Amino acid sequence: MSAIESVMQEHRVFNPPASFAKTAAIPSMEAYQALCDEAAKDYEGFWARHARELLHWHKPFTKVLDESNAPFYKWFEDGEINASYNCLDRNVEKGLGDKTAIVFEADDGTVTRVSYQELLAKVSRFANGMKALGIKKGDRVVIYMPMSVEGVVAMQACARIGATHSVVFGGFSAKSLQERLVDVGAVALITADEQMRGGKALPLKAIADEALTLGGCEAVKNVIVYRRTGGNVAWTEGRDRSMEDVAAGQSDNCPAEPVGAEHPLFVLYTSGSTGKPKGVQHSTGGYLLWALMTMRWTFDIKPDDMFWCTADIGWVTGHTYITYGPLAAGATQIVFEGVPTFPNAGRFWDMIQRHKVSIFYTAPTAIRSLIKAAEADEKIHPKQYDLSSLRLLGTVGEPINPEAWMWYYKNIGRERCPIVDTFWQTETGGHMITPLPGATPLVPGSCTLPLPGIMAAIVDETGQDVPNGNGGILVVKRPWPSMIRTIWGDPERFKKSYYPEELGGKLYLAGDGSIRDKETGYFTIMGRIDDVLNVSGHRMGTMEIESALVSNPIVAEAAVVGRPDDTTGEAICAFVVLKRSRPTAEEAVKIAAELRNWVGKEIGPIAKPKDIRFGDNLPKTRSGKIMRRLLRSLAKGEDITQDTSTLENPAILDQLKQAQ
């Protein structure tokens, strides 16, 4: 049975606990419906009310939504705001200065607590130091850092002075970093000497140095280095400065720079189906509004909660639900440097027990790998830990299969914590379709219903609505405040990718297939409709990986597809033709290992193919088109049912069944 079939046949329903609903921000389906009705009746009024109630505006807005240059929508355009002010100063002014903002746990278990007052001072000193280096409003700053308080400080400091940050995940290669530095036109790079993961020190500064030698980065005048490990690193005088030195001697007071609501807060790169990563540009006002609204609605955040989102700041989840959302909500949160399996696979449960975490938000991939570990070793099974502080669980990054959902619900939530299975994307800025923990009856594997104000629908290839029970393409019918504004430097690609003419140019295309339940109308996400893979919740374009493989001097041709994987959700399977004869036996194993490392260096370790198969050539039609559906069947080990009569060389099918 496919994952989608198992969800569609899922009839178990779990109602919100009455005790949870009693104090929830949205306490019932009636309250949910009332908000949906308000948005349907007066869409602009609905968003304006929340924006005025929830955010501090340096200059109040009078315009709500400008659709005159659709699909380049503008929200609260004449208003002025500062994201850092809303996250830090406002909480200090409310009397929360002594409240813990961040509990940082390092890879080795060392714990550091930072209050809102201390965080504001750190951000202000570093922001003043950046200004002293000539970094100013409108400049772009790339951040290539480990999970750390300093990573959050760097992002908040950029927001404070009106510089646009672009965070690059610390697992990306020098080439990936260089591409992003060039594309966004960065004037500065903030990095660290090394990062700690699973007890090992891994280079960051060395990779950053390499990226800067690959060309096109002449605009980068300052490299600021956070000394995480104190490890020996190369130093370029006049360009390189330590983060400590930049902040040293600076004032604790750095007035927040008011920026227009549409000012780009950040650009975050995500994989596209054409190979070149897309710089997703987000606004300041609309983005921050939805980050805060979803903290209140989806996570039902309360003053005494201990919130923990296990994502990395290099991904959008770490932007919205670490750097901005929790701080805008005045919450206390965990920031974690390490990995879930070090020193053992009980690390997450141990941390929940020690820090009394009440809201836990992680990826299905992490859950699936920890299920395996728990079943293999009784000592680190979650039942050995006191998880009674938990009141809410969440999942993010990819759909969760009903079996993993049930394990999470029983073993971690002890059958008393609702699970918010959140569907959203880098491009949406925040949650789109998700249960509300005090209102929505839960069905394992379904992300249930759109949040109030989100006009999600399922359509066919022409943009027409399809009836419930029929699969189709997931779209959003109206613009919303936290949506992508454009692809950095490429407005045409933005239109083509997200507002295609085939759907009439007016519907936001999520790029996912979806289906709604006939009775409940609940949404289930079925996976990408384009050539984008979702591995451990990280999106990667097949073309990006193919290009990396083909850039190896021994590779003539490569095709990449995804196949289901019990742990990572989807695994990368590469079909490769070498410039010399097809390798077999030990030679094939050796070359496959070399190619994996090559891809790791070109893109980053997360892009390494799980299996590599060698053929004399690839299956193509007589017109020379690679038969990708056939490759998907081979990757999954399925019987070939496709018509192979147009196949140029049917003998290669047996070769391509052999995985290395």
From Swiss-Prot:
Modified sites of kind N6-acetyllysine: K625
Q: Which PROSITE patterns did the record assign?
A: AMP_BINDING
Give residues annotated as binding Mg(2+). Answer: V550, V555
Entry-linked PANTHER family: ACETYL-COENZYME A SYNTHETASE, ACETYL-COENZYME A SYNTHETASE 1
- Processing and modification events after translation: Acetylated. Deacetylation by the SIR2-homolog deacetylase activates the enzyme.
Entries under CDD domains matching the protein: ACS
Q: Which reaction does it catalyse?
A: acetate + ATP + CoA = acetyl-CoA + AMP + diphosphate
Can you say what this protein is called? Acetyl-coenzyme A synthetase
> Record's superkingdom?
Bacteria
GO biological process, alphabetically ordered: acetyl-CoA biosynthetic process from acetate
Q: Which organism is it from?
A: Cupriavidus metallidurans (strain ATCC 43123 / DSM 2839 / NBRC 102507 / CH34)
Q: Which Pfam families match?
A: ACAS_N, AMP-binding, AMP-binding_C
Q: What class of enzyme is it?
A: ligase
Positions of ATP binding: G397, E398, P399, D421, T422, F423, W424, Q425, T426, D512, R528, R539
